[in-house]
Amino acid sequence: MSSEDIFTIAIDGPAGSGKGTVAKELSKILNYHYLDSGAIYRVIALAIHNKKLEFNQEKKIVELLKEIEISFEFDKTFLDGKDVSSEIREESISKLASKIAQNQELRKSLLSFQRSFAKKPGLVAEGRDMTTVVFPGADLKIYLDASVEERSKRRHKQLILKGNNVNIANLETEIALRDKQDKERVHSPLLIDDEAHIINNDGLSVEETINKILALIN
């Protein structure tokens, strides 16, 4: 069955806009499958690392994609049935994932792999390119946005809870720079699809943001 036959919700937006949390919770409410494209690159990076491949061995990596199984369950990510949620956050894996994401041939190879997550009863997919490249025919496209100030406050709160005392002004500078880089990058820049519904969730809770999306579905 093709992804066009399955109700698909694609969510994009800048870093820190809450698209990951919203997408996960939305998939639970709808009982849909869930795809986190960022985690996909990390898991593939881990699989490449485990197989001792180089990221530029594209043919071998494409073959590897046919062999591995990636799945998501609530806040956990699995590779061939093993919980790798912590492993994929390691610095070495993050760096390799970034290299893979910048390799256009590998990005193209990953298209069909990502689209294979579209299964009945439906899919909630979040991440870069979801609305424009991976699922251009998605039934519902969401661009989740929030101001730099709002995203800085959220990030500051997260870091404080982890015991890290950081300057919120520095966070604002970092996030603004990340936005600029994401929008100006040559490959896969951050874009707002013409068909996307823009939701600014400044001051909104996760539940309130999800309710706005559910209203669009209904």
Short names for language-model regions:
Residues 9-11:
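Hydrophobic anchor at the beta1->P-loop junction of P-loop NTPases
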Residues 14-17:
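ATP-binding Walker
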Residues 20:
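Walker A/P-loop
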Residues 29-90:
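N-terminal phosphate/diphosphate-binding loop that engages ATP/GTP or pyrophosphate donors
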Residues 38, 81, 110, 124, ...:
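Residue-level signal for inorganic ion chemistry
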Residues 64, 73, 114-120, 128, ...:
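Small-molecule kinase domains that catalyze NTP-dependent phosphoryl transfer to phosphate-bearing small molecules
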Residues 85-97, 101-162:
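ATP-dependent NMP and nucleoside kinases share a basic, alpha-helical "lid"
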